[in-house]
């Protein structure tokens, strides 16, 4: 088994009209053994930027703690929050710096950029090779199942309600096709005025 699939888990980010959504499953396991069903892989950096980290859980937590440390230093020095693009560049550098002994994680970054709240999403592999797009990105053990559903259901310029419905349906449909992730999901929809967070009840087996 790949070390990337050792703990299972999966994340999706999607772009809407002046909003973005990020979702992850809630399972934490060790190979086929389920340890917890309340372990989201999505972390809040600030009100307009979230990071989803799939892969080896120990590395994901270490990477998140280092990212929060860097973000707090930036906030002290600059007196403002990091934008999603800055967070993406920082994560890319942090991962590439450890390329000879990498963190076994695949981060996704999403948020709203600048005063006009332009949606931004990006993802990267374990050594920081980043990809930015304007529709959706998926990472984790159920990637093969997620791609088809996301390509089928995704539409451009969805409002926040449609975006929530679409990302939820993609998540729930994919969870049934992967034994290493599932047990429900959590969805965050980031809008210019608020962050909407909801939990989804999936199959508990």
Swiss-Prot record:
Gene from which the chain derives: psmB3
Coiled-coil blocks: none
Function: Non-catalytic component of the proteasome, a multicatalytic proteinase complex which is characterized by its ability to cleave peptides with Arg, Phe, Tyr, Leu, and Glu adjacent to the leaving group at neutral or slightly basic pH. The proteasome has an ATP-dependent proteolytic activity.
Keywords, sorted A to Z: Cytoplasm, Nucleus, Proteasome
GO biological process, one term: proteasomal protein catabolic process
Keyword Cytoplasm attached: yes
Gene3D superfamilies: Glutamine Phosphoribosylpyrophosphate, subunit 1, domain 1
PANTHER family hit by this protein: METALLOPROTEASE TLDD, PROTEASOME SUBUNIT BETA TYPE-3
A family per Pfam: Proteasome
Full protein name: Proteasome subunit beta type-3
SUPFAM superfamilies documented for this protein: N-terminal nucleophile aminohydrolases (Ntn hydrolases)
Family: Belongs to the peptidase T1B family.
The organism's place on the tree of life at top rank: Eukaryota
Intracellular or extracellular location(s): Cytoplasm; Nucleus
Chief site of localization: cytoplasm
Keyword Acyltransferase annotated: no
GO (cellular component) term, any one: nucleus
InterPro entries noted in UniProt: Ntn_hydrolases_N, Proteasome_beta_3, Proteasome_sua/b, Proteasome_suB-type
Transmembrane parts of this sequence: none
CDD domains named in the record: proteasome_beta_type_3
Subunit details: The 26S proteasome consists of a 20S proteasome core and two 19S regulatory subunits. The 20S proteasome core is composed of 28 subunits that are arranged in four stacked rings, resulting in a barrel-shaped structure. The two end rings are each formed by seven alpha subunits, and the two central rings are each formed by seven beta subunits. The catalytic chamber with the active sites is on the inside of the barrel.
